Amino acid sequence: MLKVGTTEGRFRMIMPDLMAVFEASVGIDDKNYGEEKQIRGFMADAVNLQKMISSGELDLAFSGLTPQMPADMKSRLLLDEQLFFVISDNMLRRYRPDYLPGLHNSENIADLRDFRLVPVCRSLPNLHCMEILDTVLDSLHVSLNCVHVSGHFDLHLELAVRDYAACFCLGMYLSHLERINECSENKLHVFRIKGLSDTNQVFLLQKVNHMHSMAEDVFIRLLEEKCGEIARHQDDLFGSVTADPGGL
């Protein structure tokens, strides 16, 4: 059994598809894959994922990096993930109708100074995506009206579509946002963040000198394809990470 770990949100967003496609792929020729025809998935934060890789509890993981990365672990970049600002149509009409589609903001860029009164959800403060957001907020000398903090970006989108609060969304969650919009008349609007050029990087994590099995190679290829799909999707919608979303 192939042991794969990632963070809770990423597990919910992409692991079901990866697990199903993986099992369909290796099931074509069972004898070549031995007992690694199925995946055992693990959820943990980045620090504990790194510990589990180092101790041999996981064959591989994908997440961000931390300063506590063990010396016997290697990493490879999979995805430069963008962070976006999300607000419902109802809340946009209430707080900033000038940002509605077709008006002056044709580039879909949100200046967070314009949204300081809007209630917002934030993720956990130790996450890299919140650190790069705070860098922008510090540069603007502005604080947000935070009404909810948790590590669940999919929950934040559900709160946003119910007009509880605006929120922030990583590129991996855009497909979930689009599914929400398909079922709701109160559409969620997505904006790039003015002054934010840093990305949230996702890495493949493995132990140094780890020997790949055939099944592991299949999963890594599928994971790389999925991350490439996410990168193309966010770039097609909002431009590449090399495009400047506007200075401060």
Give the ranges of each region predicted by the language model.
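Hydrophobic hinge/microswitch elements
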Residues: D45-L49, E57, P125-L188
